[in-house]
Amino acid sequence: MNESTMNTKNSEQAILNSEYYETQEISHEIKTVNASVQSSILKDTNTYLTEATFNLPDYLAQRREKVEAALESSITSGYPEKLYKSMRYSLMAGGKRLRPILCLASCELSGGVLEMAMPTACALEMLHTMSLMHDDLPALDNDDYRRGKLTNHKVYGENIAILAGDALLPYAFEYIVVQTKGVPADRLLRVIGQLSHAVGAAGLAGGQVADLESEKLQNIDLATLNFIHSHKTGALLEACVVSGALLVGANDEVLWRLSRYARNVGLAFQIIDDVLDVIATKEQLGKTPGKDEKAQKATYPSLLGINESRYQAQKLIEEAKKELAPFEEKAIPLISLADYIITRTH
């Protein structure tokens, strides 16, 4: 094994085994978010013009359209028909498609093109959808609505919803392997390893268990809450960002910076989710608000208050953006997506 291979393996292991959320000293001076970032995406989405204004709504709409088209063809019909219908029902229920868009953006930042990352982007949405289907079940959050529609188990029953989620999990990995073209096998293995880690006991599943065990406890502190959400929410979001760069064969420096960016963004995302659960309407959220308070769950607003929660989210976003400084204008989409996360209303 040569020195380069050893360094790559050591770096990969360090990312997977490091403490998922690092306590960071964050400056109390919060920079004003620049609403107009200089750049524009041409039809060749790998090219940017610094003299024009980057339009995030247009960027999101274009990317979402591409992701929707890819997802539409990712799962067709089959037997048992009810299983496939259940899988498609939740996968094609809409949503922001933020996770696949983050994957595509990090791939482009690292020098890749959309086509090489689209199968992984779709797989990430499959994994996210699986987690929502299971999270909505009566045994967990017991939600009736998701993305403005009845949850899967309300339409197909709990048994089918569980099995459809189970089916989406391995299919996501199969889809990466079968559909990705022009990417070396060793890179695909690293991507699959990253995604497996993100949804397993060291990631999403572990965070979910910690969340369940913390319900109705009165002594939940901020460190515990950070642990729960850096795993339950942040692990998969980190995989979205890092996997896009892995497909291109990005070096250790790029991977580490993107990992730190994603960890900060992931926690900020959850803080804003908690805030919106308090202040947003059912129509805005597409699901029932106020569920956390009714379940007596510890949340960022319950520990910090609304204003301090927003402040902490803003600080995390500023730290995330600092990690992207060396990439200059290539990082504009990821910077803008970070700002979007704390200004969204649903």
From Swiss-Prot:
Instruction: Give the domain of life.
Output: Bacteria
Which cofactor does the UniProt annotation name?
Answer: Mg(2+)
Gene Ontology MF annotations: metal ion binding; prenyltransferase activity
Its GO biological process annotations read:
isoprenoid biosynthetic process
Q: Which positions in this protein are listed as binding isopentenyl diphosphate?
A: K96, R99, H128, R147
Q: Which cysteines are joined by disulfide bonds?
A: none
Textual note on the cofactor? Binds 2 Mg(2+) ions per subunit.
Listed EC numbers: 2.5.1.1
Per UniProt, Mg(2+) 1 binds at: D135, D141
Q: Which residues bind Mg(2+) 2?
A: D135, D141
UniProt keyword annotations, A-Z: Isoprene biosynthesis, Magnesium, Metal-binding, Transferase
**Part of which pathway?**
Isoprenoid biosynthesis; geranyl diphosphate biosynthesis; geranyl diphosphate from dimethylallyl diphosphate and isopentenyl diphosphate: step 1/1
Q: Provide the catalytic activity annotation.
A: isopentenyl diphosphate + dimethylallyl diphosphate = (2E)-geranyl diphosphate + diphosphate
Tell me the enzyme class: transferase
**Gene Ontology CC:** cytoplasm
Q: Which CDD domains match?
A: Trans_IPPS_HT (cd00685)
The UniProt function text for this chain reads: Prenyltransferase involved in the biosynthesis of ambiguines, a family of hapalindole-type alkaloids. Catalyzes the addition of isopentenyl diphosphate (IPP) onto dimethylallyl diphosphate (DMAPP) to form geranyl pyrophosphate (GPP). Cannot use farnesyl diphosphate (FPP) or geranylgeranyl diphosphate (GGPP).
Family per UniProt?
A: Belongs to the FPP/GGPP synthase family.
Name by which UniProt lists this protein: Dimethylallyltranstransferase
Which source organism? Answer: Fischerella ambigua (strain UTEX 1903)
Q: What gene codes for this chain?
A: ambP2
